[in-house]
Amino acid sequence: MAASTLTIKDLHVEIEGKEILKGVNLEIKGGEFHAVMGPNGTGKSTLSAAIMGHPKYEVTKGSITLDGKDVLEMEVDERAQAGLFLAMQYPSEISGVTNADFLRSAINARREEGDEISLMKFIRKMDENMEFLEMDPEMAQRYLNEGFSGGEKKRNEILQLMMIEPKIAILDEIDSGLDIDALKVVSKGINKMRSENFGCLMITHYQRLLNYITPDVVHVMMQGRVVKSGGAELAQRLEAEGYDWIKQELGIEDETVGQEA
């Protein structure tokens, strides 16, 4: 299987008529881990929502392609079937659907008819991954995210990632609200996914996550655009010095785009 490439060119996105993204350019290839950092309200979460096709976010200009195919022409489920995955900051609770049923359906939705994962293979894979993420085996039969703690929801998102094995994953503030032990476990799961067939875009406020998952590229977003990119050392400098030096370097006075995004 050839490595995939997610290409974002000159992406402009509006929400309720207000422009949030103002020309984002990014390329993520299989085998690469990218981090997007930036102050609050600079469009980081808007980027993840636009990639996955959230109906509230209107793309007014630019393109998103996965291996040359137009992602913007795809429905949300088609984006997932094509190999995109979003781990959300606040995952939804779905009553009446067990974790195991949800995961098996999600895996089979990406497969051809007649090529569904066998029940035995699925159970073995799920047991192995839940043990790796130090999850209670009973969580397999609980309703999806219902009554889960914040940490359990985040582990569950990473369990989905490990079970579904997408081509490109977008992790939107997967580290928010996690204590250090949960962060280590979640990071361990993400690092286990590293391969030339898997690319990852991590959206985060904090260097803390990047202490456990070393990014190949760090991007800084301000004013709805990527204003600076560098290696892992860029995140370390941001942790030590904040964002003011970038604002001064680029002559930016107000880094937000007018709302929490």
UniProtKB/Swiss-Prot annotation:
SMART domains: AAA. SUPFAM superfamilies: P-loop containing nucleoside triphosphate hydrolases. Gene3D superfamilies: P-loop containing nucleotide triphosphate hydrolases. Residues 6-248 form the ABC transporter domain. InterPro entries: AAA+_ATPase (IPR003593), ABC_transporter-like_ATP-bd (IPR003439), ABC_transporter-like_CS (IPR017871), FeS-cluster_ATPase_SufC (IPR010230), P-loop_NTPase (IPR027417). Transmembrane segments: none annotated. It comes from the Bacteria. PROSITE patterns: ABC_TRANSPORTER_1, ABC_TRANSPORTER_2. It holds the Pfam family ABC_tran. Keywords: ATP-binding, Nucleotide-binding, Transport. GO terms for molecular function: ATP binding; ATP hydrolysis activity. ATP binds at residues 38-45. Belongs to the ABC transporter superfamily. Ycf16 family. This is Vegetative protein 296. It comes from Bacillus subtilis (strain 168). The lineage of its organism: Bacteria, Bacillati, Bacillota, Bacilli, Bacillales. The gene is sufC.
